[in-house]
């Protein structure tokens, strides 16, 4: 059994859930979407790595159906959610931006719900078109989606996340450009936009988006290249041909697959944990995070009889957090 897989998965689940309370209060749809998808994928992977530790038996076919589709949806959801963030940043920093009224806010909310929730569901549904068989089970890793690699698969599975990532980088570049051009009065610009953003939070969101999308783009290209190298593009003969053996479940034991296969899979598997750590690094040490931690410790102090010790502890923690102010100036 690989104990590192469930440990990493559940640890990353906890990390991405830490910023949830203040983002929930802010009703930031795009950021909540990232938290949801990272949390769900990390958690289900942790379960998979326990259930299928050293095994490839098809214990839970319905569970695998669900988790395999969630992976497909997440591949679209990560870049589409980040696109929503960068699009909003580019809008609020633009010199042509007007203060949003109730109608504008509703349109933005509907757009973000479509991009963050509806679009991934569409991706999961479309995946059935190129789903050659039900799913794969990999020893230690568990359920994995399968794709009939063809021209149709390029346009349904591989290219959309790449295109979304590139569009996100364009929006991030526009947002960064407006910051550079208007940096002298940028805090006033953000205040006048009624966005609730500070300069530090604005830069942190841009940095997060660029980092995650560069990483996601590189990973997507890597997966696409090795998939084409290993399998090439298979001909799309007909719907019946592609789905002729749809109920099949392929099981991959460690001893039956070459080592390079497992090395490549582990490399791509690590994309979600790394993305989770990046997300926490940007959101777990900001001003709003420190305020939330202070609030938590204040509530905890009320239940501790030794107030002097609690006050001293809180003061030390406060001093320690102050060294993370670089994004909030």
What label would you give each PLM region?
Residues 1-116:
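Membrane-proximal first intracellular loop
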Residues 1-8, 57-70, 103-105, 139-157, ...:
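Juxtamembrane membrane-interface segments at transmembrane-helix boundaries in membrane proteins
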Residues 14-21, 46, 72-99, 112-131, ...:
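Cytoplasm-facing ends of alpha-helical transmembrane segments in multi-pass membrane proteins
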Residues 50-55, 128-141, 179, 224-238:
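Membrane-helix interface motif
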Residues 106, 181-203, 285-329:
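Intrinsically disordered, low-complexity terminal tails of fungal membrane proteins
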Residues 130, 138-179, 199-226:
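Extracellular-loop-to-transmembrane junctions of the mid-late helices
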Residues 186-224, 240-266:
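Intracellular effector-coupling site of seven-transmembrane GPCRs
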């Amino acid at each position: 059994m690989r104990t590192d897989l469930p440990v990493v998965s559940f640890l990353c689940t906890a990390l991405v859930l830490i910023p949830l309370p203040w983002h929930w209060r802010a009703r930031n749809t795009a950021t909540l979407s990232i938290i949801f998808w990272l949390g769900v994928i990390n958690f289900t992977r942790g379960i998979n790595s326990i259930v299928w530790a050293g095994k490839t038996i098809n214990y839970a076919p319905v569970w695998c159906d669900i988790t395999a589709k969630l992976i497909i949806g997440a591949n679209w959801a990560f870049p589409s959610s980040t696109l929503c963030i960068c699009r909003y940043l580019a809008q609020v920093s633009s010199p042509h931006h007007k203060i949003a009224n109730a109608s504008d806010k509703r349109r933005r909310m509907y757009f973000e719900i479509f991009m963050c929730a509806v679009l991934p569901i569409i991706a999961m549904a479309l995946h059935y078109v190129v789903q050659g068989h039900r799913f794969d089970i990999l020893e230690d890793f568990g359920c994995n989606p399968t794709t009939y690699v063809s021209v149709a698969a390029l346009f349904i599975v591989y290219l959309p996340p790449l295109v979304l990532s590139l569009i996100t980088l364009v929006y991030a570049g526009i947002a960064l450009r407006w910051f550079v051009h208007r940096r002298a009065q940028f805090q006033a610009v953000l205040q006048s936009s009624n966005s609730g953003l500070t300069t530090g939070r604005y830069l942190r969101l841009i940095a997060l988006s660029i980092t995650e999308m560069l990483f996601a783009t590189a990973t997507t290209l890597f997966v696409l290249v090795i998939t084409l190298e290993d399998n090439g593009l298979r001909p799309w003969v007909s719907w019946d041909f592609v789905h002729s053996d749809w109920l099949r479940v392929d099981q991959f034991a460690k001893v039956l697959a070459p080592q390079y296969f497992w090395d490549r899979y582990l490399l791509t598997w690590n994309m979600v944990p790394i993305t989770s750590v990046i997300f926490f690094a940007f959101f777990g040490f900001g001003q709003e995070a420190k305020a939330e931690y202070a609030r938590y410790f204040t509530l905890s102090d009320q239940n501790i009889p030794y107030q002097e010790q609690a006050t001293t502890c809180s003061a030390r923690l406060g001093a320690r957090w102050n060294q993370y102010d670089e994004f909030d100036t």
